[in-house]
């Protein structure tokens, strides 16, 4: 996957074709981005193309949706959820290309229900800042200076300050005003921590503390986390 993506990203013809899969507003401003930003955006476009090609697979699961998907092939051919599966694929592609990534979740501004939409942030080492990428909408946010925005920057300008949203984007259901870095409520044993230290979740979100990407977005990661949590509870509860 990474080799195929790399070949398209470096060729002129491949870059031109991939850019057509980007959201309208991102495609218009693509040339304003620096080389590093263009590379990650083209990798985003590559995964967006895979997502569109496999749209017919979504909803036709060969296994129950709640069962974990363990590898890229599983997520490509039998996605457990479009945004989660393709965010994992983009994350692994970026990691293979030498980038650091982290998941960002978006909640509903109506009821603050989490896990409504998954996006990711990639660390740009040359620019020394995070940039948020959305695989399903093939979108990234560009500021007035032509630089990719981070999720926190989008949150700060959410509403009146954000104009370049993709078509059919539901601002209430997928709200950056309700973004989070890790859904700590799903982590085994976190309820005990929250009871002992009220506001722990809010503190962790404010300080951008997140579980490693591989734990949050892979079946192996969650099984390992559950096993660790169960073992920790067995040790803590007797005390």
Task: Tell me what each language-model feature is.
Residues 2-81:
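Secondary-structure boundary elements
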Residues 41, 81-88, 92:
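A structural signal for well-ordered alpha-helical segments within the folded catalytic domains
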Residues 76-83, 109-113:
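Short capping loops/turns at secondary-structure boundaries
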Residues 88-161:
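Hydrophobic/aromatic-rich core segments of domains that either
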Residues 138-210:
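Extracytoplasmic/lumenal ectodomains and periplasmic regions of secretory and membrane proteins
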Residues 208-231:
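Juxtamembrane/start-of-transmembrane alpha-helix segments at the extracytoplasmic/lumenal side
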Residues 229-239:
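Alpha-helical transmembrane segments
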């Amino acid at each position: 996957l990474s080799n195929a993506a790399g070949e398209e990203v470096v060729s002129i013809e491949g870059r031109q074709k991939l850019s057509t899969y980007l959201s309208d507003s991102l495609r218009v401003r693509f040339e304003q981005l620096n080389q590093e930003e263009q590379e990650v955006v083209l990798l985003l476009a590559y995964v967006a193309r895979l997502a569109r090609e496999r749209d017919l697979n979504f909803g036709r699961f060969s296994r129950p949706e709640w069962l974990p998907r363990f590898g890229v092939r599983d997520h490509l051919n039998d996605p457990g959820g479009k945004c989660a599966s393709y965010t994992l694929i983009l994350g692994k592609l970026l990691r293979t290309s030498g980038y650091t990534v982290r998941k960002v979740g978006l909640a509903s501004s109506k009821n603050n229900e989490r896990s409504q939409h998954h996006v990711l942030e990639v660390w740009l080492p040359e620019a020394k800042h995070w940039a948020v990428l959305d695989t399903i909408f093939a979108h990234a946010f560009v500021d007035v200076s032509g630089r990719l925005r981070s999720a926190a920057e989008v949150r700060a300008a959410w509403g009146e300050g954000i104009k370049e949203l993709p078509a059919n984007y539901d601002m209430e259901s997928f709200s950056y005003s309700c973004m989070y870095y890790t859904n700590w409520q799903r982590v085994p044993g976190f309820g005990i921590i929250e009871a002992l230290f009220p506001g722990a979740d809010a503190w962790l979100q404010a300080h951008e503390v997140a579980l490693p990407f591989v734990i949050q977005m892979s079946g192996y990661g969650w099984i390992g986390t559950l096993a660790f949590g169960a073992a920790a509870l067995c040790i803590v509860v007797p005390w």
